[in-house]
Design a protein with these regions (language model features):
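C-terminal effector/interaction modules appended to NTPase cores
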Residues: 11, 19-25, 218-430
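Long, well-ordered amphipathic alpha-helical subdomains in the mid-to-C-terminal portions
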Residues: 198-224
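Conserved G1/Walker A P-loop phosphate-binding module
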Residues: 1-78, 82, 86-87
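Canonical P-loop GTPase G-domain recognition
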Residues: 126-133, 138-197, 206, 235-244, ...
Length: 430
């Protein structure tokens, strides 16, 4: 991640759906005013979802997702369509693009008036309650009277769904399409802070950032950057230190430290250094609350005590990165899991968008903080785990639990602390 770029997971995700050669890529280029997507008369130019980071004013930072055609053919085409459908799990706004000139009279009169393939994805969009706009593209190919007739037919069958008529050739209708996107965009100001709601003006927040072989050269990792920015936005003061200098840092600050936020991997060492009077949590736990469901992830950690020999454990990460010899997902967590349970477990890992379709074989899922994932994608993964009856826990919560400091690590969140007492999830007595 660039130090100056908005994280992809925090951008408004706008997915574009339609048949091959409906003009999806042309619409992307016209809306952004840039040649971001390849435009070709050859069907199926877009073979996989293509992600384009972009600023669209006044929405702000967006991620435009150009998906494969809904009418793609063959076994490979079927897999491409499946990938396009999976994009809905992270979508904030959908654009359903039609070539209005190719709609037959029969298609106009059937169902929602937009064609069978389009109606199938439309039903999925509505089922997921994703706001969307119907884009009638290539309007320049029709006479005005015929265009108006078709537009009215589609509007009559689709209730309050915005319907925009555009021509990417003549550059008409684009302002109305942008207005529709602005109207449908989520209010990002209502999004839960990472830590800002826990910070008062002039509060000193101590961040413990280990610099080891896994740390990127010359910069901080994404969750650290984002927490610092959230503290600044709420007029707090960030003090960044490493584990060896933490004690001296706290001594220098005296009673000014409001809280300590650490990399979860250092939970054990940091907990011994930080006085009990200072609240302690981790970047990973903050992101569990920010993008996931903290209560569900805390409840899932107790499954650790029920694991048996031969159980399959999935360790999942939202990003892809080069693995190091002391990688947290493939080395450290499996080691802590084995050390804590004493069981012979089958550990499997996945990263990026490669989250398994079938979760039922797993006895437990241990997921990263999801800093690179869109909030909807992270919550969808948690929901799917719940549907499959598989306990899911976050890296930070798992590490705090096996290190015996779970209660302390969530004391900043009264509802979660109360849950631990109610459910008798108390690592201190074990």
């Amino acid at each position: 991640m660039s130090l100056t770029a908005t994280p992809n997971g925090d951008r408004v995700q706008i997915a574009i759906y339609g048949r091959r050669n409906a003009g999806k890529s042309s619409v992307i280029n016209a809306v952004t005013g840039q040649q971001l997507a390849i435009v070709s008369e050859v069907k199926g130019t877009t073979t996989d979802p293509v992600y384009k980071a972009m600023e669209i004013l006044p929405i702000g930072p967006c991620m435009l997702i150009d998906t494969p055609g809904l009418d793609d053919e063959g076994e490979l085409g079927k897999k491409r369509i499946e990938k396009a459908v999976q994009v809905l799990n992270r979508t904030d706004i959908a654009m359903l693009v039609l070539d209005i000139s190719k709609l037959t009279k029969w298609e106009l009169e059937q169902g929602r008036g937009i064609g069978r393939k389009e109606q199938q994805i439309q039903e999925m969009i509505e089922e997921k309650k994703i706001p969307y706009v119907i884009v009638l593209n290539q309007s320049d190919k029709l006479e005005p009277e015929e265009l108006e007739y078709r537009r009215r037919c589609i509007m009559a069958k689709n209730g309050t769904v915005p319907v925009c008529t555009v021509s990417t050739v003549q550059k008409t209708g684009l302002d109305k399409l942008k207005d529709a996107l602005v109207m449908l965009a989520p209010d990002t100001d209502l999004k839960l802070h990472i830590v800002g709601d826990l910070v008062n003006e002039n509060d000193v927040i101590v961040l413990v950032v280990p610099v080891d072989s896994a740390a990127p050269k010359g910069r901080l990792i994404m969750p650290q950057q984002q927490v610092i920015r959230d503290v600044l936005d709420n007029h707090g003061v960030s003090v960044v230190t490493q584990v060896p200098t933490l004690a001296a840092t706290l001594e220098m600050l005296g009673d000014k430290a409001r809280m300590v936020i650490t990399d979860s991997q250092a939970f054990g060492e940091v907990s011994e250094i930080v006085p009990q009077r200072i609240p302690l949590t981790s970047f990973s736990i903050l992101f569990a609350r920010h993008k996931g469901n903290l209560q569900t992830l805390v409840e899932g950690v107790t499954a650790t005590d029920s694991l048996k020999d031969g159980d399959r454990i999935l360790i999942a990460e939202g990003c892809t990165h080069r693995r190091q010899c002391d990688d947290i997902g493939t080395v450290k967590i499996p080691h802590w899991l084995q050390e804590y349970t004493g069981r012979k477990l089958q550990i499997e890992t996945c990263s990026g968008t490669g989250f398994p379709t079938d979760l039922s074989p797993y006895s437990m899922i241990i997921h990263c903080g999801g800093c690179t994932l869109h909030e909807k994608e992270m919550k969808h993964r948690i929901f799917r785990a719940q549907q499959s009856g598989v306990p899911i826990v976050n890296y930070g919560i798992f590490i705090a639990y096996v290190k015996g400091i779970l209660r302390r690590s969530v004391e900043l969140f009264p509802d979660i602390s109360e849950l631990l007492k109610k459910e008798k999830i108390d690592e201190a007595d074990r």
